[in-house]
Amino acid sequence: MKPSVILYKKVADDLRARLDQHFTVTELDAFPALDHPALATAEGIIGSGGKVDKDFLQHAPRLRAASTISVGYDTFNVDALNEKGVILMHTPTVLTETVADTVLALMLASARRVVEVVERVKAGEWKGGVGSDWFGTDVHHKTIGILGMGRIGLAVAQRAHFGFSMPVLYNARRHHAEAEERFNARHCDLDTLLAESDFLCITLPLTAETHHLIGREQLAKMKPSAILINIGRGAVVDEDALTEALVKGTIQAAGLDVFVKEPLPVDSPLLDLPNVVALPHIGSATHETRYDMAACAVDNLIAALSGQVKENCVNPQVLK
């Protein structure tokens, strides 16, 4: 008899067929849907979004594996999963290059004021030669500081070093030999990173240690010409402090793909600022990469429920 699983995000037809080959699949339009009878027999879940916590696990007593179509897993209570022995799988490898491309897009858009200038053109303000009030700042040869040198940080460093001849600084728990050898990256403490970076690129996940890691005190240590880029998690940055810094000119601009509350409320003060480029958390949102993420998540669930896990496991201790 096939294991029962819950699918809570639509996937391509071929991927759905693969799930059907291995499992008895119940597809939910809403999740977590605690009152749905499929939870009682589900051994696996696959999708993205929705909270998986102790309450959910009480309604899914047979759950053995959860496969999220994402790198981030902050919607999962990992401690609760560990207590129940539930394997949590994610997709950390397939979106690296696409998210790194998004970082460069945010850097260029913020530095060259692309969104602001486009809106001015559409509003009919381009009536002749452009003056300095239309100017942006260069990206090439500027110093990039990367906060968190994981897969995405390394891919950003590659683009910055080879594509824009940028000196690379980084702050991480340990030295990254590949970054230092290939891109001449320099490991430094956080204060040095803040003080010397023209672009501060945040790639960190959200943890107790990284929550509001960048606040008013840290922003004050940055250059007035600096641009902050965040594609990690919104709450790594204190949004109130960031808004204040952007209004006061403590830093020049920000390019943001992640926010504390998503979708970003329409009354967020960040949306009123011309020096903010705000994206709707689309760092990995290309047709190719989203397909690859879903395919990886399907493979992950099959591996987890067949006892064949070799990679992409968030909590490998439950495998022992």
Curated annotation (Swiss-Prot):
Record-level GO cellular component terms: cytosol; plasma membrane
E.C. number: 1.1.1.79, 1.1.1.81
Keyword Cytoplasm applies: yes
SUPFAM superfamilies: Formate/glycerate dehydrogenase catalytic domain-like, NAD(P)-binding Rossmann-fold domains
Subcellular location: Cytoplasm
InterPro entries: D-isomer_2-hydroxyacid_DH (IPR050223), D-isomer_2_OHA_DH_cat_dom (IPR006139), D-isomer_DH_CS (IPR029753), D-isomer_DH_NAD-bd (IPR006140), Glyo/OHPyrv_Rdtase_B (IPR023756), NAD(P)-bd_dom_sf (IPR036291)
Keywords: Cytoplasm, NAD, NADP, Oxidoreductase
Principal location listed in the UniProt entry: cytoplasm
Reaction catalysis annotation: glycolate + NADP(+) = glyoxylate + NADPH + H(+); (R)-glycerate + NAD(+) = 3-hydroxypyruvate + NADH + H(+); (R)-glycerate + NADP(+) = 3-hydroxypyruvate + NADPH + H(+)
CDD domains cross-referenced by the UniProt entry: GDH (cd05301)
Active site as annotated: R233, E262, H281 (proton donor)
Single Gene Ontology MF annotation: NAD binding
Family: Belongs to the D-isomer specific 2-hydroxyacid dehydrogenase family. GhrB subfamily.
Function: Catalyzes the NADPH-dependent reduction of glyoxylate and hydroxypyruvate into glycolate and glycerate, respectively.
Assembly description: Homodimer.
Name the UniProt record assigns to this protein: Glyoxylate/hydroxypyruvate reductase B
Organism listed in the record: Pectobacterium atrosepticum (strain SCRI 1043 / ATCC BAA-672) (Erwinia carotovora subsp. atroseptica)
